[in-house]
Amino acid sequence: MTGERVLVTGASGYLGGAVAAALLAAGVPVRTLQRRPSGVPGAEDVLGTVTDPASRRAAVEGIDAVVHLAAKVTFTGDPAEFAAVNVEGTRALLADAAAAGVTRFVFVSSPSVAHTGTSIMGDGAAPAEPSRARGEYARTKAAAELLALAADSPSMAVTAVRPHLVWGPGDPQLVARVVDRASKGRLPLVGTGAALVDTCYIDDAVDGILAALRRIDVTHGQAYVLTSGEPRPIGELFSAFCRAAGVRPPAVHVPVPVASAVGAIAEVVWRIRPGDDEPPMTRFLAEQLSTAHWFDQRRTHEDLDWRPAVGVSRGLERLRAAHRDATVAAGAGDLAE
């Protein structure tokens, strides 16, 4: 990728920012597109959205490759907004990228595009199914992935990667939510907590995405799931996150039907009273927390020529170290006041 310029959309997010930083560290010039400054030193920020034609076209001008992560990622919200950002924004970005002469395009998707509510055990990257996907995010990401793969052509190669449950130090989503809710005694385990779940440590997710970009002559027109390949019981994983942060792990179990019913009620309440916060439970979340999600990674490893370098155990060591360092730094700050 030396000498090429790469656009990363959604670089103010956890994964997008890490992708942009990794490219810059490798000597690749990076431009970003998102609503607010990316915070990535050395990146050229274009402030805007994929739904705005002016900022979108400015972002792709003179670009060789695109890594598209920008999306509306919430459990609830206006279906029209999900469609505008995730589907129509992707459609327009693909068209503008092709018109600007972009030759490689990586669409960062999600395994939820092929999740129909039942356990996934050892499957590969099944085709995205918008009509069967669960929730507006999954439905619109599935539709967007189909658009992206349909745009694959000799002039612009397109591939899709689906990192699953990305986590690590500084993660504002999975780890932060688990730890925050556990610290308040609001993190019950749905079902037995024994459902096996694959995850992807942040550095491994970044490496996998960049491998898909490097190997796009092989990966174009196809979708790939990215995970550590080390499924763990979800209760064990959540407990490990909590212990790393010095928080008591969850011990209360809630039956799946109860969690689903609570989720259905919460969805109605949040539609009536929309706000910036997320509901404590949704039907989609209840399914995600009670069903297995682990994947066959053999095709991913072969086609991307990639293996996760960190994995779960080393990732947890790094998470513990990061929390320990943050605690020491906070204590030093208190003493200095």
Per-region residue spans from a language model:
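NAD(P)H-binding glycine-rich loop region in Rossmannoid oxidoreductase-like domains
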Residues: 47-88, 96
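Conserved Rossmann-fold NAD(P)-dependent oxidoreductase catalytic core, especially the SDR/UDP-sugar
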Residues: 92-136
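Active-site Tyr-X1-5-Lys
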Residues: 132-159
